[in-house]
Amino acid sequence: MSMATGVEPTIDVKVFVDKERGKVLFAESGKEFVDVLFGFLTLPLGTVVRLLGGQSQVGCLDELYRSVEGLSTDLFRIEACKAMLLRPINAAAKQCCQLTVRVDDTKHREVYVCADTSCSVTAFSSVTGAVCNCGRIMTQLAGERPENPPNAAASGACEDGAFVKGGMKFIVTDDLNVAPASTSLMLSLLDKFQVPDPSCLEQMTLQFSSVKIIDLLRRSLTSQNPLTGHYLDVAPDDSVVDMLPEYLHPEEQDNEAEHSLVNASLRVLQTKNNSKVLYAEVGGDFVDLLFGLLTIPLGSIVKTYGKSASKGCLDNLYTSIAGSAHGCLRPECQNLLLSPMLAPYFGYGASKMLQVEELAPDKLDINACFKCFKSRGFANHYLCHVEPWCNYQKRYVKICYEKGKTTKLCELDPKTPEGGCEEAAYVKQGPQKFIVTDDLHVLPLSLASTLQVVIEAKLQRKDLVEKEVALTKPQVMELLRAALVTHRALSTVLLPAKINKKLHYHSFCLY
């Protein structure tokens, strides 16, 4: 909501509707709406699931998210690991904070330090529950670090938006192709949609609040016509086949060593007739691989898998950046959207497999001693330099007697207990085993959990067989992709390809 008026901001978008066909053909908007659309590409998958209330209907993501929620914190390396997966930080949060309508409320500028004032470790974490090098939990919130440098767009010093340049109108098609408005584009659209008389189109102005933006996000993930679905308030189209397309990366020619993944060996319980995988018995490293999906931005998924990344039309939005909307983005935002990154230290598992890079860890220069900063935070650390007049002593008296009045803080890895330098996983590595069901729900391995899966499948012992599977890199890539488009990820990838894997897509390109 607007701090000044208390009224939630909205964005006006004019849609052009073909009433006879019951379809929104395209929409016209300013930079505000296009900024929000491009902002979708920066959202981590875990944030998407959370914003959609765990009902995203995007493959197995809802089950993965529920698995993290349900697992005991004892199974993670430290408590912070669970929080990082449930509320991953957006690496482009600085830009997203400038959006007219914001949907992601994740705190990205919070600074946590060790609460022990005697601790001299000059480090901070962006995530609560991290472990200081001294071994204590970093629970002391120092406040939010200021943006440096302050953004001109946020202060109104220029007309540009969060991602796109200002001063122009944009056309957005029903399947989220974006381009600057022009006469040639108008004529092209009328021809494409076979509209001989433009007066037949009905023009409506829609107001998009945060709730409606979230609804549009949901539809963009599952529909080729999100604007029409939103305008007519129709249920998402479920006609798209819930299976993988043909093999994803036939062009890859990895050598044999690269095909063999360390510790990617599964014990699979499946039906003898190869109709279904019930679950896989796995170690913590495989669980980390899956959980890592929740930290990856939508744009990185589209960059890797293209049209096969989802049943929706975010691929059109992505290709517009370097295609029909080329030249419309602020120069510093072009690569940020084409190759979205992870927040510092959020990378592991799936992000390494998909080669998604991390931002460099942040560093803070504090104009105060460390003790004053710890106890007073950003709001009052200036008192470190204050010498108020003391009537009793008839002189100016220092509040702080520390000699060093400046502090340099380095961001530490929240996943690494006690400041270890090795790359840290989210899940504890050790003898603990897990089961991963066909829809990628993760549970600690136990007799009760395995029997429950078999009972729910309504299968007899004679129908079941256990197999050992060693996954190759291409299979892991397929599995991660399957997690985004089907509720039967394990069956789709591990069983013989006798099931129809064809996906049907309907897309309209501007040029």
Please identify what each model-predicted range represents:
Residues 1-511:
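Long, position-biased, composition-driven segments near the start of the mature protein
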